[in-house]
Design a protein with these regions (language model features):
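C-terminal intrinsically disordered extensions
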Residues: 4, 75-79, 151-152, 156
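Short glycine/proline- and aromatic-enriched beta-strand/turn motifs that initiate or cap beta-hairpins
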Residues: 23-72, 167-173
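Gram-negative (and chloroplast) outer-membrane scaffold detector with strong preference
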Residues: 49-142
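Solvent-exposed loop/turn segments connecting transmembrane beta-strands
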Residues: 32-45, 85-87, 115-125, 150-159
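Cleavable N-terminal export/targeting peptides
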Residues: 1-27, 170-173
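Short glycine/serine/threonine-biased micro-segments
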Residues: 31-33, 110, 127, 163
């Protein structure tokens, strides 16, 4: 009888550890990030992330980018030289394999592609980078992203920079 109770307790302990270990696997999040990119650019990204096994994830995103310049007439940045200099928008997908895991944080490569437009023609990008996530209460995550975009048919061949943002869980936990 004592051996049966020990086995039942062991089974309960193993089952509870399995439930805790997979608490954030297969979850979805909506994210918003903003960043500064070289040379004289800012971007904003709205994303939906689907997490798979072992913190790997697929991200579907919409991105907007603005590149500012000095106004040649007045010699400094104006509203027109900021907002109307060079703008792009794009939609894309990125695969994010987890490469580092710690307590309440993890890091992932970000590899993907996107398509979109500037104000005149079609533009495509190859996206690569590293994203580090910090897990807060209730599944909310803060992230820092080092990113590089290789443009196809765009004015900027390379865009590289840093973004920060937050992700909120959606659906049932």
């Amino acid at each position: 009888m004592n051996a049966i109770i020990k086995r039942m307790m062991l089974a309960i302990c193993l089952a509870s550890m399995t439930a805790v270990a997979s608490a954030q696997t297969y979850s979805n999040r909506i994210g918003l990030g903003v960043g500064a990119l070289y040379e004289r650019g800012f971007d904003a990204t709205l994303s939906v992330e689907h997490e798979t096994k072992n913190h790997n994830a697929w991200e579907y995103f919409i991105n907007g980018y603005v590149k500012y310049d000095k106004d040649e007439n007045v010699g400094h940045i104006t509203n027109d030289s900021f907002w109307k200099n060079y703008r792009t928008w794009g939609v894309g997908v990125a695969y994010k394999p987890c490469v580092f895991r710690g307590k309440n944080n993890y890091g992932a490569l970000r590899l993907g592609g996107s398509i979109g437009s500037d104000t005149h023609e079609f533009v495509g990008w190859v996206n690569a980078g590293y994203e580090h996530n910090f897990v807060l209460h209730h599944g909310i995550k803060l992230f820092v992203q080092a990113k590089t975009d290789l443009a196809i048919n765009g004015l900027d061949l390379f865009r590289t920079g840093v973004s920060i943002g937050v992700k909120f869980p959606v659906g049932k936990r």
